[in-house]
């Protein structure tokens, strides 16, 4: 197994890389199997944190507003990671959001990775749950604040080392780097007609928002318009 990698975890506003956004990135640089450096940031999405996500992560709107723009966050992660392979628990999920954000901001991201979830499925098939929290409990790894990016990235690194120590000799093929793939669909920008209608709706219904309308995609604008019409009604 590689002894130098970056363990990463992200928190997001939902489950869809296309529709939802990065809320937090946490990363841990590992060299010779030991933590060398850590990096992390909250991200200001410009949108309120959904109640379910706020309850799950503990990330509030005040915390979100203290974060950096997504461009700065993605650039910071790419600089921290360099060209090292990644590691994480269900890493394809994290990679999909990172790749989507990178492409949106005109950056590139390709990676090989070790997925502790995939490794656990090969080495611990009898376990009823292979969630990060369940595996941390099994190996007595302190999980820190669950569903916070930095702590989950650290937990994934420690779990990877535990799995390697126990199963590296028995199941070496489980610890081979795998290429990560995620295809980003082309997003059309918001139309001038949508901009005008959305601004009119916000003004008419006296809705305050942190969202930058100019940066929205066509599909994002459509969803926001539909949501306002459903919750507040048409302009009379």
Locations of regions flagged by a protein language model:
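Short, glycine/acidic-enriched loop or turn micro-motifs at the edges of active sites
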Residues: 12-14, 118, 155
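Acidic two-metal-ion nuclease catalytic site recognized across multiple nuclease folds
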Residues: 159-236
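A short, structured active-site edge motif that brings together acidic residues
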Residues: 111-123
């Amino acid at each position: 197994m590689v002894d130098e990698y970056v363990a990463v975890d992200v928190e997001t506003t939902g489950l869809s890389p296309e529709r939802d956004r990065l809320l937090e990135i946490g990363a841990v640089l590992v060299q010779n199997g030991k933590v060398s450096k850590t990096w992390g940031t909250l991200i200001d999405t410009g949108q309120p944190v959904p109640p379910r996500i706020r309850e799950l992560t503990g990330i509030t709107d005040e915390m979100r507003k203290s974060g950096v723009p997504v461009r700065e966050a993605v650039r910071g992660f790419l600089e921290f990671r360099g060209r090292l392979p990644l590691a994480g628990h269900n890493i394809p999920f994290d990679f999909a959001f990172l790749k989507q954000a990178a492409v949106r901001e005109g950056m590139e991201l390709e990676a090989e990775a070790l997925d502790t979830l995939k490794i656990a499925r090969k080495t611990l098939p009898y376990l009823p749950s292979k969630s990060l929290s369940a595996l941390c409990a099994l190996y007595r790894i302190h999980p820190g604040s669950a569903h916070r990016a930095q702590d989950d990235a650290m937990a994934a690194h420690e779990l990877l080392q535990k799995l390697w120590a126990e199963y590296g000799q028995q199941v070496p093929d489980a610890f081979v780097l795998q290429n990560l793939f995620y295809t980003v669909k082309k997003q059309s920008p918001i139309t001038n007609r949508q901009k005008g209608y959305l601004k009119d709706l916000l003004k008419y219904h006296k809705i305050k928002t942190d969202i930058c309308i100019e940066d929205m995609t066509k599909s994002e604008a459509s969803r926001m318009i539909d949501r306002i019409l459903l919750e507040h009604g048409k302009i009379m």
